[in-house]
């Protein structure tokens, strides 16, 4: 099933693109404060609360500090690529957010609550997310530092391990809906129920792979401070370092918006027609969830991430893709997927709860 959507004039598209860029940059600034305050609460501390009322001006202080720090370009660096790398990371991080619908058609002052609406939206998102890694790779290559190069190589190698699972997880909603358009996916969920219920394994794989793609704990291996002295941005300082942080947080925010859009109904809700509020609450929940994981989880080793990507994420995503494809190809009732999805949840829960812990070395109790 396909739906038709109105098209905005070019000036409105440009205005909405500007609003998205300004909004994401503002969100990045305040997410640094929110994350630090939440991490502090998890660790029974106060967090930054000195600059301005309740510490609300801390992002401004951080921005001023970054701008006025000395901007160093090391002698052995490739200057052009060294400067280009953080710009690539930020630009491709910004490009994905414009496709996300935040409400029904015509709900943004008579215009559409998205920047652009592409029939190949999922393919576009996948391509943009893959291109963003070039910024990380070029930063390590151009820095002339072995730590930076190792960080960028880690990012490139781990990308292959989790992106295959992520891509297959995206195909589950595409097969069910029969469209690559994000608005079609949201409208299908409005009529048939959240895709999370039909494809729990795909949801789980996409959630985990999104954390890896945003380089969030426990998958922040490219910048592991204890092992790589900061990783791919070891040699960066001042505003260039801030641009890498900006790209990471924008990926973080975009992932938190895409997960509910693809699997949790987007702006729709069975009760109370307040689409912008529901979308904001779902986005805020996943922002909090990712910060919670960072506060309570440990960083995986490099080999553990590769083993996890190839040994768990990819097989699980492939299995569910084949199951979904079989149900769709044979035109079986979609309730079969509901039962299989619930069964997969119980199996995975049982595996987590009843997996025996490895014996301690040395035979200690």
Curated annotation (Swiss-Prot):
For this entry, list what GO says about its biological process.
aerobic respiration
| UniProt superkingdom | Bacteria
Give the membrane topology.
Answer: Multi-pass membrane protein
User: Where would you find the membrane-spanning parts of this chain?
Assistant: 11-31, 80-100, 120-140, 157-177, 192-212, 252-272, 273-293, 310-330, 336-356
For this protein, what reaction is catalysed? a quinone + NADH + 5 H(+)(in) = a quinol + NAD(+) + 4 H(+)(out)
In its keyword annotation, does this UniProt entry include Thylakoid? no
Q: Which cysteines are joined by disulfide bonds?
A: none
Q: Which GO terms describe its cellular component?
A: plasma membrane
User: Which keywords does the record carry?
Assistant: Cell inner membrane, Cell membrane, Membrane, NAD, Quinone, Translocase, Transmembrane, Transmembrane helix, Ubiquinone
Entry EC no(s): 7.1.1.-
MF terms from GO for this chain are: NADH dehydrogenase activity; oxidoreductase activity, acting on NAD(P)H, quinone or similar compound as acceptor; quinone binding
- Database matches in InterPro entries: NADH_UbQ_OxRdtase_su1/FPO, NADH_UbQ_OxRdtase_su1_CS
Going by the record, the broad EC class of this enzyme is translocase
| Description of how the protein assembles with itself and partners | NDH-1 is composed of 14 different subunits. Subunits NuoA, H, J, K, L, M, N constitute the membrane sector of the complex.
Q: Which family does it belong to?
A: Belongs to the complex I subunit 1 family.
Q: State its role.
A: NDH-1 shuttles electrons from NADH, via FMN and iron-sulfur (Fe-S) centers, to quinones in the respiratory chain. The immediate electron acceptor for the enzyme in this species is believed to be ubiquinone. Couples the redox reaction to proton translocation (for every two electrons transferred, four hydrogen ions are translocated across the cytoplasmic membrane), and thus conserves the redox energy in a proton gradient. This subunit may bind ubiquinone.
Classification via HAMAP family: NDH1_NuoH
List the protein's name. NADH-quinone oxidoreductase subunit H
**Gene name, Swiss-Prot/TrEMBL:** nuoH
């Amino acid at each position: 099933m396909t739906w038709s959507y109105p098209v905005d004039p070019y000036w409105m598209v440009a205005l909405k693109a500007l609003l998205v860029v300004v909004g994401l940059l503002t969100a990045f600034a305040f997410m640094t404060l929110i994350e630090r305050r939440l991490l502090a609460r998890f660790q029974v501390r106060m967090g930054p609360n000195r600059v301005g009322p309740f510490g609300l001006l801390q992002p401004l202080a951080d921005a001023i500090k970054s701008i006025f720090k000395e901007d160093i370009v090391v002698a052995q660096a490739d200057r052009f690529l060294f400067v280009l790398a953080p710009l690539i990371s930020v630009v491709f991080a910004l490009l994905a957010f414009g496709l996300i619908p935040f409400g029904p058609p015509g709900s943004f002052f008579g215009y559409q609550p998205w920047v652009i609406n592409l029939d190949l939206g999922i393919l576009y998102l996948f391509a943009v997310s893959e291109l963003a890694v070039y910024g990380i790779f070029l930063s390590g290559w151009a820095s002339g530092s072995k730590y930076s190069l190792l960080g960028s190589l880690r990012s490139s190698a781990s990308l292959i391990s989790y992106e295959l699972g992520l891509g297959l997880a995206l195909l589950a909603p595409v097969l069910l809906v029969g469209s690559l358009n994000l608005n079609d996916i949201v409208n299908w969920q409005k009529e048939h129920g959240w895709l999370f219920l039909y494809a729990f394994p795909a949801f789980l794989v996409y959630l985990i792979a999104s954390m890896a793609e945003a380089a969030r704990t426990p998958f922040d291996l490219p910048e592991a401070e204890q092992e790589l002295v900061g990783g791919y941005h070891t040699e960066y300082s001042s505003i260039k370092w801030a641009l890498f942080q900006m790209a990471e947080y924008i990926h973080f925010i975009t992932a938190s918006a895409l997960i509910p859009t693809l699997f949790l109904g987007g702006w729709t809700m069975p009760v109370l027609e307040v689409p912008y509020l529901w979308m904001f609450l779902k986005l805020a929940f996943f922002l909090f969830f990712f910060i919670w994981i960072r506060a309570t989880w440990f960083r995986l080793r490099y080999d553990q991430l590769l083993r996890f990507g190839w040994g768990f994420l990819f097989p699980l995503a492939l299995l569910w893709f084949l199951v979904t494809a079989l149900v769709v190809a044979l035109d079986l009732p979609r309730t079969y997927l509901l039962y299989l999805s619930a069964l997969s949840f119980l199996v995975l829960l049982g595996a987590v709860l009843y997996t025996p812990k490895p014996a301690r070395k040395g035979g200690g109790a």
